[in-house]
Amino acid sequence: TYADAFLAFSGDSSIKNNTLFFYDLNAKANYQIDEKNTIYLSGYFGRDELGLSETFGFGWGNTTATLRWNHLYSNRLFSNTSLIYSNYNYVIQNFLQENNFKVNSSIRDMNLKQDFQLALNNSHNIRFGLDLIHHTIAPGKITASASSSVNEVAVQKRKGSEIAAYISDEWELNDKINLVYGLRASSFFLFGPGNFYRYDADGKTNST
């Protein structure tokens, strides 16, 4: 958007110095290596910003990118191998000198997927594969200048991974009955150092 470009023409200084804009960008491309192999690349980039003169600022954004390889083993079996990246972050700022501060937070994921589809016949398809996701979460970090009365704080980052395997069967028995069933097994792992707490029934910490 171009809203903030018009703010500069305002005669009111409290409006003139404000910030107001957002953007969204999508991009896609593909390349066929040969009859059995095709590469797909896609991405999304978005950002929103709001600022009130020299008082307050707030912004957030998303970035995602996907690289996918499609491979045909035969006329009945094909696979998709996907590498997916996503990042969400936001920033809050207070520009008042005596209480100035900046807050940052983000969630970043890396995802690897391997999917297969086997066509037993025109009405019977089996899908199976693996899914691995690694999470990095930065809950919050507060920074401030030396003259600010705000104390700096950094919440510990958290890292974890999910892994899953699945298989499903889609079977069109006739023109009125379509049967779909499957099985999925998943697990979650937490990595890295950090403080972890146990709580009792009253919500109080009983161990660290």
Question: Residue spans of the language-model regions?
Answer:
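General secondary-structure edge motif
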Residues: F9-S10, E49, L96-Q97, N104, ...
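Signature of Gram-negative outer-membrane beta-barrel scaffolds
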Residues: R127-T208
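Short, structured coil/loop segments at alpha-helix boundaries
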Residues: G11-D12, D34, S74, N174
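Surface-exposed loop/turn and secondary-structure junction residues enriched for glycine/proline
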Residues: A5-F9, Y23-L25, N80, Y166
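Short secondary-structure transition/capping segments
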Residues: A8-F9, L52-S53, I92, G192-P193
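Surface-exposed beta-strand-turn/loop segments characteristic
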Residues: Y2-T19
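Outer-membrane beta-barrel domain signature, strongest for Gram-negative TonB-dependent receptors
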Residues: L20-A138
